[in-house]
């Protein structure tokens, strides 16, 4: 059993956060999670959800220092007094960014890492690694270089490394953020299996639809406090308006319909012609031919590892192993030119945040930045209160919004977003969608790698489905295509 008793916590000024009251800080949390319960923690980005998980696994206060009042009890023992090695044997954590918890360069070693630290015999380690891969249906990922994995595949390995250790408590922070629909369905199945085994599960999540028949309780946080503790039945009875007023996303994707466009033919501005992409001389995508016009918002859809991010990197001149040409207005453009005219919001935005403050990041590397545009964009994405904060101190969703802000401010002609809604609540997703629509109206070409159907329906005018190394389908978002698009979006990832 996990118990929070009048728990308040504020990050130390020398720790991850800056001094002063922050929304990530917690105030007077009283919460009991019984053995075998699955509890969903949700709420606006930066409201303290991740901090709660850090208190359970002991990272607060052992790794993240701060002012701690009250108690967190794990089976009756104060977590702050339990040695970290002992807590780690009881509590398994999958972080929001799985890259931050990897210690090895190959997948088998990563899955085995926790078992090795607990001094299991070699034979047992090999058996547990094999069983974890089999149970989680990721045998195809064994023996792989971690750096070659997609974001979704990395999340699967992080989950497997925890599953192999068989903890009694699972802490999952945004576990679906980079997963395709098939993988989300698999995650759903894994969670049901863990529940049947009597495991205790705490899930931090914005994407709620796949958890509605799993979660026993839904805890909504707001500015570091528990706003409401719902039973599953109570939560499902909320209206869309009530849910959205708390910054929460849809519970039923079937209600979402794609944006309908006019479908008018426009002049081709960008054209990949007979393009093939390789990774370490192995073909990823072959013979890609397509035509794109200014103002289009194109969704790149398909299973984890199919090559969506590789195609995005090639579009903006960041991928080396390539055959074929890219044409702009009918003329071949070089890799260097593509780099100049494009900007990419990466799947892991930590790779592209360089400045010492949020405000400085918004104009970092941009010649003659428009001060008014910087201020307007920061305000639109609710980044103004954090203007003097270091980007590294932001929550995952806040970092995502910051990277999107730079995408608007840089005034590039070609903008690529790789999973831009990872870690975003409903309101933040709507704000990013508004930015995307505005950029489209300005004549930019936008490509969005996404598994987020809710976001897709608010932004995209066209969908490219990648499968088996090629463009499997290319559909405009027209009225007559609505149902086909919905089915394709899900079936492209294996879910009906």
Q: What do these predicted regions represent?
A:
Residues 205-206, 450-451:
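H-loop/switch region of ABC-family ATPase nucleotide-binding domains
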Residues 42-44, 301-303:
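The feature captures the beta-strand-to-loop junction immediately N-terminal to the Walker
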Residues 123-141, 371-386:
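Conserved ABC ATPase "signature" region
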Residues 57, 316:
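Helix-to-loop junction immediately C-terminal to a conserved catalytic motif
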Residues 145-149, 153, 390-394, 398:
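Conserved ABC ATPase signature
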Residues 170-173, 415-418:
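Catalytic Walker B motif of ABC-type/P-loop ATPase nucleotide-binding domains
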């Amino acid at each position: 059993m996990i118990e929070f008793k009048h728990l308040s916590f504020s990050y130390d000024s020398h720790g991850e956060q800056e001094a002063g009251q922050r929304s990530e800080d917690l105030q007077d949390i009283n919460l009991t999670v019984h053995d075998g319960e699955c509890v969903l923690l949700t709420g606006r980005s930066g409201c303290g959800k991740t901090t709660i998980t850090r208190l359970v696994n002991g990272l607060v206060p052992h790794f993240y220092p701060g002012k701690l009042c009250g108690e967190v009890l794990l089976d009756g023992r104060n977590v702050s007094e339990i040695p970290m090695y002992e807590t780690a044997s009881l509590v398994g954590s999958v972080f929001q960014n799985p890259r931050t918890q990897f210690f090895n360069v190959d997948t088998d070693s990563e899955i085995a890492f926790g078992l090795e630290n607990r001094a299991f015999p070699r034979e047992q380690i090999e058996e547990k690694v094999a069983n974890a891969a089999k149970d989680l249906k990721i045998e195809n990922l064994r023996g792989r270089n971690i750096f070659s994995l997609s974001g979704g595949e990395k999340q699967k390995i992080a989950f497997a490394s925890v599953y192999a250790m068989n903890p009694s408590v699972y802490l999952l922070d945004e576990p679906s953020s980079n997963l395709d629909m098939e993988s989300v369905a698999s995650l759903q199945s894994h969670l049901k299996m863990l529940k049947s085994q009597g495991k205790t599960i705490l899930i931090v999540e914005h994407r709620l639809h796949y958890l509605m028949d799993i979660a026993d309780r839904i805890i909504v946080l707001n500015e570091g406090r528990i706003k409401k503790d719902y039973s599953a039945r109570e939560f499902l009875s909320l209206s869309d308006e009530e849910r959205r007023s708390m910054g929460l996303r849809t519970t039923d994707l079937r209600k979402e319909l794609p944006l309908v466009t006019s479908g008018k033919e426009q002049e081709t501005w960008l054209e990949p012609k007979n393009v093939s992409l390789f990774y370490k001389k192995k073909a990823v995508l072959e013979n890609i031919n397509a035509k794109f016009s200014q103002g289009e918002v194109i969704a790149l859809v398909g299973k984890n590892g199919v090559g969506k991010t590789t195609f995005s990197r090639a579009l903006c001149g960041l991928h080396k192993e390539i055959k074929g040409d890219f044409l702009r207005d009918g003329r071949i453009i070089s890799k260097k030119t593509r780099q100049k005219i494009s900007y990419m919001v990466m799947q892991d935005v930590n790779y592209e945040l360089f400045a010492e403050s949020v405000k400085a990041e918004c104009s970092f590397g941009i010649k003659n930045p428009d001060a008014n545009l910087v201020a307007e964009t920061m305000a639109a994405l609710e980044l103004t209160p954090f203007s003097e904060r270091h980007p590294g101190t932001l929550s995952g969703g806040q970092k995502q919004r910051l990277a999107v802000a730079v995408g608007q401010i840089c005034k590039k002609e070609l903008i690529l977003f790789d999973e831009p809604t990872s870690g975003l609540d409903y309101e933040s997703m709507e704000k990013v969608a508004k930015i995307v629509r505005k950029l489209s109206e300005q004549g930019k070409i936008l490509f969005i790698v996404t598994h987020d159907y809710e976001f897709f329906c608010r932004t995209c005018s066209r969908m490219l489905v990648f499968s088996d190394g090629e463009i499997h389908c290319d559909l405009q978002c027209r009225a007559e295509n609505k149902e086909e698009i919905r089915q394709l979006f899900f079936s492209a990832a294996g879910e009906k």
